[in-house]
C-alpha cells in the first residue's frame, strides 16, 4: 500500500485554479478593511501572529508547489527564516522582522499568480 498513491482524487486544472484564486480572494476580502495595527494579536499559545500566518501559508504554497515541484527560486529572499514553522518556534514568531501587511499581501498575490500559472502550464 502506498498511501499517497492509493488514496487520491482528480480535479481538472480549471477547478484547481479556481480553488487557488478563491482562497486568495476570500483572504483579501477578510483583511481588506483592516489597518496595520489590527493584524497584531497578543502572544497566545493557541494562535500565531496573524501577519505571520498569512506569510506562512503563502510560504508553504511557494515552497511545496513552486520551489519543490517546479524548481523555482524563492520569491521572497529570507522567507524560510521568517515563515518556516518547522524551524521557528511558536513564541519566536512574535519578534520576527516581518514584512509589512501590504508587503505580505503582495507576496501572497505573487505566489498565488505563480501557482495559477504553473497549474495552467500543465
Where are these regions (language model features)?
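Helix-loop segments that flank and shape redox-cofactor active sites
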Residues: 25-49, 67-74, 117-122
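Short Ser/Thr-interspersed hydrophobic loop/turn segments at strand-loop and sheet-helix junctions
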Residues: 60
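N-terminal regions that are enriched for targeting/export leaders
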Residues: 1-39
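Short, helix-capping/interhelical loops that line the mouth of catalytic, cofactor-
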Residues: 1-15, 63-118
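Ligand-binding pocket scaffold of soluble enzyme catalytic domains
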Residues: 57
Amino acid at each position: 500500500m502506498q498511501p499517497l498513491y492509493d488514496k487520491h482524487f482528480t480535479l481538472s486544472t480549471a477547478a484547481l485554479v479556481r480553488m487557488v484564486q478563491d482562497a486568495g480572494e476570500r483572504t483579501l476580502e477578510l483583511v481588506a478593511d483592516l489597518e496595520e495595527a489590527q493584524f497584531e494579536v497578543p502572544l497566545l499559545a493557541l494562535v500565531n501572529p496573524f501577519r505571520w500566518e498569512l506569510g506562512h501559508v503563502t510560504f508553504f504554497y511557494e515552497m511545496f508547489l513552486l520551489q519543490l515541484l517546479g524548481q523555482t527560486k524563492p520569491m521572497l529572499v529570507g522567507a524560510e527564516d521568517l515563515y518556516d514553522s518547522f524551524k521557528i518556534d511558536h513564541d519566536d514568531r512574535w519578534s520576527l522582522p516581518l514584512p509589512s501587511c501590504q508587503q505580505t499581501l503582495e507576496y501572497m498575490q505573487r505566489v498565488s499568480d505563480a501557482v495559477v500559472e504553473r497549474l495552467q502550464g500543465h
